[in-house]
C-alpha cells in the first residue's frame, strides 16, 4: 500500500497494535509497503522466512517482525510474535475512509416507518422500506436497497449497490461489499407431472456481528427456518450460500465456493476456493477443506480434507483418464487372480 494522508509515529503504532518498539519512537510513518518496495516513511513486515533475504536491504523506516529475526534488521523494529496479525492491525490504521458523503442524501427514499439510529450515513439513491431499522453509526452506500423489516446493526457498512431483501437481520460492525445480495429466494421447487411448483421461501437470514461478506456473494433466505452466518465469519467474493445453510462463528470461506441447501459448517473452519459442498451435510468445527474439493458426505472429525486431481501435462492427464476408465475391469481381474491364488493355496 502506498502513502496516504494518514500519519503516525512509531511509538503510536506500537501502542495501537500491541508491539514492542525497539528504536526511535518519534519516527513518522505515512504508509505500508513490502520489504522490497518500502521507502523512508513507510513500515513493512516479515511474516514468512522466505522473505528474510530482503530484510537487510529494506529501506522501510520500521519492520513488524518476530523476536527471532529482530536482531537481523538494521532499522527500527516493532516486535510481535504474530507479525502477520500485526501487519493486519497496522493496515487498518492506514485504510482511508471509503465514503466522502455525510448525513442522509436528499435522493434517498426512506419509508416513514423506518428507524434510523444516531449518526447514520445514507448515500444517494438508497431505498429503505417500511419498518427497516438502521443502527447507530451505520453507513449505507449509494444505490443500496434495504427491504421491509430488515435490521442493519450499529456501525455496519454496506458498500455501494448492496441488496438486502426483507426480513434480514445483520449484526453490528459487519462489512458487506458491492453487489452482494442478502435474502434472495432459495432454490426450491416441487416436481409435479413434469412441471415445477415454486416453494415460497418463508424464512429469513441472520448474520452475526463482525461478519464480512465479499462482492457479488449471494446468501439465500431460508425456506422455513433462517439461513445463519454466525459472528466473525468471513466470506470472500462470488460465494453462493443456499437456503437454510449455517456457517459457524469465525469460519472463513474463499471465493467461488457453493454451499448447497441445509448444510451446516462448523466454527473456525477454513474453506478453500472453488469448493463444492452438497446439501444436507454437517461439517464439524476446525475443518480445513482445500481448494476445488467436492464434499459429498459428513465430516465428523477436525482435520484437512481434499479431493480432485492436481494439474499435470495434458498428455499425461489423457493417459491417466484412459487408465481410470479401466479401473473396474482391472479390479475384476485382480479379484479373479486373488481367488485363483487362494484356490491354489487351499489345494496345497
From Swiss-Prot:
Keywords assigned by UniProt, alphabetized: Acyltransferase, Lipid A biosynthesis, Lipid biosynthesis, Lipid metabolism, Repeat, Transferase
Matching CDD domains: LbH_LpxD (cd03352)
Pfam family, any one: LpxD
GO molecular function: N-acyltransferase activity
Any GO BP annotation: lipid A biosynthetic process
Active site: 243
PROSITE patterns cross-referenced by the UniProt entry: HEXAPEP_TRANSFERASES
EC main group: transferase
GO cellular component, one term: membrane
Catalytic activity: a UDP-3-O-[(3R)-3-hydroxyacyl]-alpha-D-glucosamine + a (3R)-hydroxyacyl-[ACP] = a UDP-2-N,3-O-bis[(3R)-3-hydroxyacyl]-alpha-D-glucosamine + holo-[ACP] + H(+)
Annotated S-S bridges: none
InterPro entries for this protein: Hexapep, Hexapep_transf_CS, LpxD, Trimer_LpxA-like_sf, UDP_GlcNAc_AcTrfase_non-rep
Recorded metabolic or biological pathway in which this protein acts: Bacterial outer membrane biogenesis; LPS lipid A biosynthesis
Enzyme Commission number(s): 2.3.1.191
Keyword Amino-acid biosynthesis belongs to the record: no
Family recorded in the similarity comment: Belongs to the transferase hexapeptide repeat family. LpxD subfamily.
Protein purpose: Catalyzes the N-acylation of UDP-3-O-acylglucosamine using 3-hydroxyacyl-ACP as the acyl donor. Is involved in the biosynthesis of lipid A, a phosphorylated glycolipid that anchors the lipopolysaccharide to the outer membrane of the cell.
NCBIfam families reported in the protein's UniProt record: lipid_A_lpxD (TIGR01853), PRK00892.1 (NF002060)
Subunit structure: Homotrimer.
Listed name of the protein: UDP-3-O-acylglucosamine N-acyltransferase
Organism of this sequence: Hahella chejuensis (strain KCTC 2396)
Amino acid at each position: 500500500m502506498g502513502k496516504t494522508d494518514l500519519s503516525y509515529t512509531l511509538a503510536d503504532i506500537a501502542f495501537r497494535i500491541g508491539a514492542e518498539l525497539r528504536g526511535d519512537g518519534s519516527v513518522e510513518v505515512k504508509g505500508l509497503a513490502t520489504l522490497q518496495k518500502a521507502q523512508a516513511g513507510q513500515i513493512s513486515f516479515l511474516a514468512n522466512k522466505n522473505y528474510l533475504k530482503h530484510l537487510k536491504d529494506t529501506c522501510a523506516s520500521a519492520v513488524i517482525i518476530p523476536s527471532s529475526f529482530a536482531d537481523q534488521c538494521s532499522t527500527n523494529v516493532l516486535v510481535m510474535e504474530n507479525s502477520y496479525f500485526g501487519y493486519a492491525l497496522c493496515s487498518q490504521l492506514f485504510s482511508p475512509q471509503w465514503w466522502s458523503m455525510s448525513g442522509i442524501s436528499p435522493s434517498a427514499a426512506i419509508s416513514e416507518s423506518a428507524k434510523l439510529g444516531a449518526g447514520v450515513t445514507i448515500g444517494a439513491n438508497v431505498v429503505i422500506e417500511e419498518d427497516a431499522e438502521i443502527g447507530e453509526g451505520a453507513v449505507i452506500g449509494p444505490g443500496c436497497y434495504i427491504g421491509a423489516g430488515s435490521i442493519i446493526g450499529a456501525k455496519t457498512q454496506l458498500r455501494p449497490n448492496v441488496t438486502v431483501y426483507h426480513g434480514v437481520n445483520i449484526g453490528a460492525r459487519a462489512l458487506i461489499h458491492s453487489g452482494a445480495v442478502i435474502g434472495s429466494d432459495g432454490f426450491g421447487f416441487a416436481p409435479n407431472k413434469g412441471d415445477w411448483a415454486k416453494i415460497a421461501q418463508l424464512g429469513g437470514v441472520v448474520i452475526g456481528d463482525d461478519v464480512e461478506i465479499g462482492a457479488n456473494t449471494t446468501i439465500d433466505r431460508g425456506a422455513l427456518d433462517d439461513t445463519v452466518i454466525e459472528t466473525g465469519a468471513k466470506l470472500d467474493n462470488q460465494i453462493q450460500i443456499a437456503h437454510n445453510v449455517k456457517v459457524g462463528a469465525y469460519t472463513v470461506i474463499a471465493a467461488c465456493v457453493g454451499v448447497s441447501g441445509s448444510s451446516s459448517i462448523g466454527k473456525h473452519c477454513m474453506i478453500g476456493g472453488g469448493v463444492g459442498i452438497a446439501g444436507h451435510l454437517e461439517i464439524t468445527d476446525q475443518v480445513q477443506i482445500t481448494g476445488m474439493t467436492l464434499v459429498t458426505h459428513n465430516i465428523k472429525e477436525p482435520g484437512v480434507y481434499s479431493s480432485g486431481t492436481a494439474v499435470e501435462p495434458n498428455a499425461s492427464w489423457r493417459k491417466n483418464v484412459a487408465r481410470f476408465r479401466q479401473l473396474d475391469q482391472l479390479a475384476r481381474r485382480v479379484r479373479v487372480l486373488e481367488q485363483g491364488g487362494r484356490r491354489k493355496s487351499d489345494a496345497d
